[in-house]
């Protein structure tokens, strides 16, 4: 539960930024509020961005652009998303809780918060996505994921180059709608591979050694083993570190094999 003292609907991004800068410690940018309601918090000023048109999915200037207020369910249903990258973005979110939840949860909420359990950030990393911030401008998602959360900025959109790359996503869950125990995503463009692993349970990261194995033709199994050895894995209520390490080898191998099959088609 959370308590809000002042709830505002800015009409422009400039107004939203000005409101946020008044007090970045107690002001909060609202998304779908799916995760915010899980804790207990007093919010001095809640800034609702729903009137700013950030819920659009566009293809322009050679990029697929996902507004920060785009819902996860839109990723499953929008033709511009489902027809690209072998539908990886719709696939990666399809097991998250249920459709009513995915109709509320947003791209911005998942990406900006850098949740370790986020299926979406894992998939986006494999697609070489970038984020666009109001103050910080455009930067690679990998760089954004590695940085501390800055509550004085606003995420506007996520951009993915519409380059026709093939992609695949794999995850293991204790139940169908649970958070992932581990997740892996792989993409390939002109023989160059990108591999990412999420829910370690830390934030999703790129795995360069696994990508190198695929680039050098060492095969999917070698890539999986490289991912298991390069990255660190932790223990939480869903799984132990050793189990996650074993899962990484399997899921990276499976995603790589799936992507290889797609490349043959």
Indicate where each model-derived feature is located:
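C-terminal structural segment of proteins
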Residues: 1-265
